[in-house]
């Protein structure tokens, strides 16, 4: 069973949570703070290596609880909370809901990749349904919308999940348009990483999931 954090780890987790929430409260480009907290927890679970069936079941259950937590997030409430910031009153709420929902759904997909044991506990069509939702939310935030720049990470997850060449091309073009608006270096890295993931998928090397594949020491790849 995944170990409970020691005292120092608990304090560190609290400090990280507080920092994340402060950042989210002061920037409309942030995804919902709770999504970031869920991703942090999922990343930690992805490093757990079960030693027997009991520990594998416990890991799957822990991942499932994270998945449910992500799916239960009230994105509308989060989107409306920006009205407490006078400088951000003009941010469109409808597209903010879609951007926040894209992060929530992308977080759920990340959990299924980072903790593959969870997949046995959800319906077989869960990933495809989440992928469809993610593309819907992304398509609802057009280039000219101020929330467009906030969809880079869920856009990357959409590309990583996509096996359909048309969807892959759609994500590539979206990220290329994003980088022309805001030439952030990590977007170039995201595009390069997607090429790697798609290439590995064509070779049949991502059965365990793209997160776990990229975490393989032989890949010499850093996953944050």
Q: What is each stretch, according to the model?
A:
Residues 175-224:
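Intrinsically disordered, low-complexity regulatory regions with latent secondary structure
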